[in-house]
Amino acid sequence: MNPTLNILGISGSLRAQSRNTGLLRFAKQCLPPTVNFQIADLSDVPFYNADRCDSKPEPVQTLIRQVTEADALVLACPEYNYSIAPALKNALDWVSREPDCAPFNGKPVAIMGAGGGMGTSRAQYHL
């Protein structure tokens, strides 16, 4: 049996009917059974606050654990006001505060997005 590849999808949108979360769900359906694809839930991740870094809230601890355990990341990034969606930026801020950005080290990251007009190109550029 092939080893399992663990991929974590992170959507920058908190909307229930998000196109970007839908894009992650579609990607999950396209993968073989040897790939474990989870989608992180950012809905309860509070705004980053440096004063809370020593006692991270449970949703933040869960996110850090998911990123750490993943072999690769897929970021689905909507574009809000010509830049990165706040929920995604906030999640990246929390995880990047770990010593030496350890959860991200050595991980391949794919970036995708769904949107009208210019799509999500400007947000992807900022990432």
Locate the predicted segments by residue.
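N-terminal beta1-alpha1 ligand-phosphate binding loop
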Residues: 2-34
